[in-house]
């Protein structure tokens, strides 16, 4: 769901089906690295290096270690495994290691959501103008750490096609609000939940 850094789709990249996960994460929209812990990244004081050959993984549903369902080879060491190889970064308080408790902020509404709601309304009304593109580009530019006017430093949205903008906006919301519990409401509003959730 995360685009490439140049704004193109990952699945348009030749050989994407056979890439190692670390390769899949390279040269992606910066929001990917803010959503999950990339391999080889220091997170909460530990360099994250997932291994699928670990013997045990923590199962929070039962509150104990269980045999790793992804176990392929018996491992001599077991550290920081996960069933999928993915660990969530977004919304995780890095201070949790102090006392294993966290007090994360509760998001009521983000400015990015306001901007994308505005753009979505303009797109659905087919009243696409400069303000529509600016709203979307402000969100995308923030992710790249630049001003929305610096269009040479991020893949600025320039199309004015209603159908293309609808697709871009939906992808943008998926990337921007990962792990923020808004996706289900987007799918319901767009009337595509049944199709998307029953693939």
Tell me the role of every PLM-derived stretch:
Residues 1-199:
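Acidic/polar-rich alpha-helix caps and helix-coil junctions
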């Amino acid at each position: 769901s995360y685009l490439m850094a140049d704004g193109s789709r990952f699945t348009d990249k030749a050989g994407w089906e056979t890439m190692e996960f670390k390769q899949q994460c390279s040269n992606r929209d910066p929001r990917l690295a803010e959503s999950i812990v990339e391999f080889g990244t220091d997170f909460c004081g530990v360099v994250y290096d997932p291994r699928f050959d670990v013997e045990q993984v923590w199962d929070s549903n039962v509150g104990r270690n269980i045999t790793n369902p992804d176990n392929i080879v018996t491992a001599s060491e077991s550290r920081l495994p996960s069933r999928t190889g993915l660990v969530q970064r977004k919304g995780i308080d890095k201070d949790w290691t102090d006392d294993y408790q966290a007090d994360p902020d509760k998001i009521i509404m983000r400015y990015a959501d306001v901007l994308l709601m505005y753009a979505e309304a303009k797109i659905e009304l087919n009243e696409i103008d400069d303000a529509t593109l600016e709203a979307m580009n402000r969100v995308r530019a923030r992710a790249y750490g630049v001003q929305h006017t610096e269009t040479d430093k991020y893949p600025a949205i320039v199309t004015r096609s209603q159908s293309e903008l609808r697709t871009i906006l939906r992808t943008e919301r998926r990337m921007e609000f990962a792990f923020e519990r808004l996706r289900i409401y987007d799918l319901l509003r767009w009337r595509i939940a049944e199709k998307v959730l029953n693939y």
